[in-house]
Amino acid sequence: MGCNFSSQSKLQVPEIRASRSITPASQKSEDPYSHIRLLLLGSAESGKTTVLEQVRLLYKQHFTESEYFHRRAFIYHNIFKSIKALCRAMRMSDIQFADPINMGRAQSIIADEHGHYGLFSKDLAEKIKHIWNDKSMQKLYARRSQFNLNDSASYFLNNIDKINMVDYKPSERDLIMAYVPTCGVQNVIFTACNQSFQLFDIGGQKIDRRKWALQYEGIDAIFFCIAISEYDQVMSEDMVTNRLDDALNLLQSISEDPAFATTPIYLFLNEIDVFCEKLSVIPLSKYKPDFKGGDQDDAIDFMENLACEALGKRDRSLYRVYRCIAIDTQMMAELLSTVFKDIAKRKK
């Protein structure tokens, strides 16, 4: 597939019916097996919740007012977390602010320990805007592949004036771009290919994984997300374990679990765009010595081979591998349509 991801053709997404809300998995319908049950798994920040959000938007699953409120809170948090990460990166870099006043502004941002889940004060909003618009900060941002930064940082920072309004309501695009960690177990029921599906999303942090086994019964297919761009990053839980290694080990454990011996796995290799951007700055071979070099396509092929190796001796008919950008709605519409057709075909 390579790194050319733009799609020019206009998608014709069929009219789809969906249930009203996301509910904890414990609140299942009276007949839990009346739907094709899908389990969405992956490490934290792998993009799996973005996949769930795409399903909700593409398959007409509307958000409630409380869900908008919840996501709006995390958008403010995303903005502050991003500007704080950029300020810290600036402090560690060889770049100086073009406007010296921004150095003091950045120091105050770094020292601010509040989570900021609501409207910014006028003073804080101005600080963020001045820092973000500094010419030197834009030079630093061009190096973003060298440090851990939310993919949506520029999107939200460029829209801070719109977002920092009392009557702000997130757009569909805002909902997709926001990083909102999964709390507990959520599920959505929708209809595709004349079949009723129920998709479960479970938190991907290590502390949440003990809950996974509670959802294993009666699962018809697994969606597993891996953010391949994280080959150089470590997990926030211990600051030691490589994120990609953790994801591959997790995939291997799922593939080897007797409960899923005959369950098809749909593997989403996510963040292909970020991965390609990183390669020229952070060599893949530094973290994966078995990679002998080549172009971006060779690197992506290598990552796919790693994932297939993690699947072990699983029959080829029991897994599919897709390369994707989870925040790209058009790409995900095409991908999900293909996946749901394949699952529906298996169930006939």
Curated annotation (Swiss-Prot):
Cross-referenced InterPro entries: Gprotein_alpha_su, GproteinA_insert, P-loop_NTPase
A Pfam family hit: G-alpha
CDD domains (UniProt xref): G-alpha (cd00066)
Residue ranges of every copy of the G-alpha domain listed in the record: 34-348
Disulphide-bridged cysteine pairs: none
Residue runs in coiled coils: none
Region listing for G3 motif, in residue ranges: 197-206
Lipid-carrying residues in chain (N-myristoyl glycine): 2
Segments for region (G5 motif): 324-329
Single GO MF descriptor: GTP binding
Region described as G1 motif: spans on this chain: 37-50
Region (G4 motif): 266-273
Tree of life domain: Eukaryota
Record-stated family: Belongs to the G-alpha family.
Identification of the protein by name: Guanine nucleotide-binding protein alpha-13 subunit
Organism per entry: Caenorhabditis elegans
Chain's gene name: gpa-13
